[in-house]
Amino acid sequence: MSPKERIIMGVDPGTILMGYGMLHVAGNTPRLMAMGVIRLEKFDNHYIRLKRIFDRITGLIDEFLPDEMAIEAPFFGKNVQSMLKLGRAQGVAMAAALARDIPITEYAPMRIKQAITGNGNASKEQVAGMLQRYLRIPDEQMLPEMDATDGLAAAVCHFFQTSGPMARSGGSAVKNWKDFVNRNPDKVR
């Protein structure tokens, strides 16, 4: 790969379905490499799901060799247990990237939607449709699970935030555990 080429892995954390997308960037031209979902519904035990997330994210990293990871931040809901589980799933995906020294940038869901559609309150369908048009994804490659396009959206958002003359200062890249702990003392003890 030339110095101006990179691969961005996007992740939409989840405890039932976790979406991912791989984006190859050459210069200022992004191209879809892959997108999909990690299915976790068949595992009753939450800890087994976390292990599966780690194993699958690590496998995807080993297969596609991404240079960077963009991950959607958990949204704040009313159900504390759901938030805890989602945060754990996100943390395990981040740990897999950090174990391979892949820098991570986290983006809020509204920021991703804003970057893709121009509307921070866009629906999942609107995000998927815009990604399909922008990346020229054939209908047969689109998946019924919107988690896959949500993962891809994180990667495309990161591309927009870091590439070309329109790049704006965006999320904060975390290069290793020490960096993460220093930036987030309230999240660790």
UniProtKB/Swiss-Prot annotation:
Keyword terms: Cytoplasm, DNA damage, DNA recombination, DNA repair, DNA-binding, Endonuclease, Hydrolase, Magnesium, Metal-binding, Nuclease
Cofactors demanded by this protein: Mg(2+)
Location within or outside the cell: Cytoplasm
Main location: cytoplasm
Keyword Cytoplasm: yes
GO MF terms, alphabetically ordered: crossover junction DNA endonuclease activity; DNA binding; magnesium ion binding
Note accompanying the cofactor annotation: Binds 2 Mg(2+) ion per subunit.
CDD domains: RuvC
EC number annotated for this UniProt entry: 3.1.21.10
Reactions mediated catalytically: Endonucleolytic cleavage at a junction such as a reciprocal single-stranded crossover between two homologous DNA duplexes (Holliday junction)
Residues that, per the record, bind Mg(2+) 1: 12, 147
Keyword DNA-binding: yes
Entry GO terms, CC: cytoplasm; Holliday junction resolvase complex
Example GO biological process: DNA repair
Pfam family, one: RuvC
Sequence positions that bind Mg(2+) 2: 72
Entry annotation: catalytic residues: 12, 72, 147
Similarity field: Belongs to the RuvC family.
UniProt subunit comment: Homodimer which binds Holliday junction (HJ) DNA. The HJ becomes 2-fold symmetrical on binding to RuvC with unstacked arms; it has a different conformation from HJ DNA in complex with RuvA. In the full resolvosome a probable DNA-RuvA(4)-RuvB(12)-RuvC(2) complex forms which resolves the HJ.
PANTHER family: CROSSOVER JUNCTION ENDODEOXYRIBONUCLEASE RUVC (PTHR30194:SF3)
Role according to the record: The RuvA-RuvB-RuvC complex processes Holliday junction (HJ) DNA during genetic recombination and DNA repair. Endonuclease that resolves HJ intermediates. Cleaves cruciform DNA by making single-stranded nicks across the HJ at symmetrical positions within the homologous arms, yielding a 5'-phosphate and a 3'-hydroxyl group; requires a central core of homology in the junction. The consensus cleavage sequence is 5'-(A/T)TT(C/G)-3'. Cleavage occurs on the 3'-side of the TT dinucleotide at the point of strand exchange.
Protein name: Crossover junction endodeoxyribonuclease RuvC
Gene name as annotated: ruvC
